[in-house]
Amino acid sequence: MSWKPSSVANPPNKMRTLILIPTETEAAPLRAACPDAPVRIAGVGMAAAAAATARIIAEEHPDRLILAGIAGASDRSVAVCEVVAVAGERIAELPGKYAVRYAADFIPAGLRTVESNTTNRTGVAASGTQIENMEGAAFL
């Protein structure tokens, strides 16, 4: 299957979408399946993801960004290899009043929604989250 940016990702008179993925290793399956997919590498961690997101917005002016990648499940209700959409993101290491929830603005497309926490190390869980990643809060 070939991705058709002009007709699928960016139909006439529609929003221009870019897909941010932290690493080339994570992006490889999408690039192999859809060589023309509008993929950009965001980098690993909050600082890299925030900088890449800001740069991509400033340089490419997309209408919509999608952050995709591999996350760890901190809740057994999330199956291995399950695709989910993040409804909200927290930074797990921030204490008390600083532990705010960043709401995601997304189109669920039939995906199960979960809460996520962005963490710099494993084993740090924010209350009520099902998955963890290293970039989400910086992206939102």
Predicted regions and their residues:
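Glycine-rich phosphate- or other oxyanion-binding loops that anchor nucleotides, phosphorylated ligands
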Residues: 14-16, 26-140
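Gly/serine-rich nucleotide phosphate-binding loop at the start of the catalytic core
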Residues: 20-23
